Amino acid sequence: MPPEPFEYAVLRVVPRVERGEQLNVGVVLQCRPRRFLGARIELGEAKLDALRAMAPDIDADAVLTHLEGIRRIVAGDPDGGPIAKLARPERFHWLVSPSSTMIQPSPSHTGLTEDPQASLDDLFAKLVG
């Protein structure tokens, strides 16, 4: 198959919005021609320690709950709320819309792929680690 266009955004935790410090914790990728919407999200102990260094009073459970909500929206899980029930492209655009909350997406970027899942994994490795 020929390469198809995709869009992606990096998910960032911004523990104190007023300070602008951020930690990359995931990537959301959409490839419309392949009907693909996927996310890789990871907030392990090392990243939690980094967040606590930025904001000692951070509510880690709240962050984890919000990240789980994003996973559910991507999967179209009915427990993900009304946004999870939208069509794939609409869910992607809701997830990557600018916000001033603790979890923020980067600006949306584009690329070409023959394998959206492999591109998601590659971007995650490069941008989140």
Q: What are these language model-derived features?
A:
Residues 1-129:
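Polybasic/polar functional segments that serve as interface/processing modules
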